[in-house]
Amino acid sequence: MWNTLSKTPSPCGCLALCTKALHQIVVCIKIPKLKMKVYFYHTRLTTESYLEWQKGLFPGHLLYGQPEMEKYGIEFVMHPYRHFPSRLRLMLYVLCAVLKRRSSFEAIYATSFRGLELVIFLNALGLLRCPIYTWHHTAVTTAKSVWRELPSRLFYRGIQGMFFFCQKHIDESLKSVKAPAHKLHLVHWGPDVPFYDGIMKSASSPQVPVFISTGKENRDIQTLMQAFANLPHRLDIYIAEECGGINYRRVIESQPKPDNINVHYTEGVIPHRLAQIVAECSCVVIPCLDFPYTVGLTTLVEALALGLPLITSRNTYFPMDIDKEGIGITVPYGDVQGWADAVEYIAGHPDEARQMGRRARLLAEKVYNMEVFGRELAEVINSRQS
């Protein structure tokens, strides 16, 4: 409204004009979406591994997709890893580390809940008020004792989302009241393909069949060595002296060791060096003990990325059907003759073995890789903002 005496806008008119102009300015300015800050909890060296990944010396899938998720507007606060032999001391340290940084993140992403238990209980009691998303490496089960089941139910209330490697774990978890379907997410965990592309550039193919076993968790080394004892083919074993209560040195030294079997004891986490060695072999062998989870999956996805055929124990928790996909041969648990036959088949059919390797690589490129599962994880974690 105009003041007819002064011919100048009234105060109300000025306010309206200013508001309109301000609205036009705001519309023209594209306000960037703020990144979601997430606390990244890992059970091994975190920042150091990330820096190695940036240099191409560490595979990103062992960081459980953290580098890939940065593409989707997630900024990570790294957990300051420290090793503790005592589980209680670990839990207390993790609790202090999380509470100290609580104001700097909106959610927690964990590769395992080991060490995070006190944080999860606080969240369940409403004292932390922070969404927690964690990988669950086995199925959620119901305790036989009510005194164990009751605190367990409280514990799982503190977790907003769980990521699983295979559908079988989800199906088994759904039998428990602690695992409602909306909390369970199947993720196509797979290799950091560009990392292995760099490895393969300098790798050379063996002139004779070379079989290799890596990994240290629940491996059936006894069956594997017995299978190779009467075969002419070379087997290289890379394994820790002891892991998870199994003394592999003792197991190996109790077996006859012919000249075609070479054993190398490893220390620490050396994925880059092991990948270089595996890339120059003919076939990856994964002898597993019978446990209800994805024993050997890390070794398996590495073989996919390197385009190598597989011989594995028939682990029904693997996310893919190895025989059906045509990427290798599976053998029943503890079947020495079955292993020997599979090795002879791969060695005697090199063209078919190469085809298995090509199909394995294609599976990594299309389905099981860090680009795919990083996006899947980010979609779940980012969903709380929508």
Feature-to-residue mapping (PLM):
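A short, histidine- and acid-enriched strand-loop-helix "catalytic/donor-clamping" loop
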Residues: 83, 131-146
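Nucleotide-activated donor-binding/catalytic signature segment of Leloir-type glycosyltransferases, i.e.
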Residues: 239, 248-278
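Conserved acidic donor-binding segment of nucleotide-sugar-dependent glycosyltransferases
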Residues: 324-336, 345-351
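Acidic anion/phosphate-binding donor-loop and adjacent secondary structure
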Residues: 174-175, 183-185, 191-208, 222
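Membrane-proximal helix-turn-helix segments that form the acceptor-binding/catalytic region
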Residues: 96-103, 143-163
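Acidic donor-binding loop of glycosyltransferase active sites
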Residues: 278-293, 308
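Conserved donor-binding/catalytic core segment of Leloir-type glycosyltransferases
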Residues: 202-219, 224-236
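A short, well-ordered alpha-helix in the C-terminal region of glycosyltransferases
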Residues: 345, 352-366, 376-379
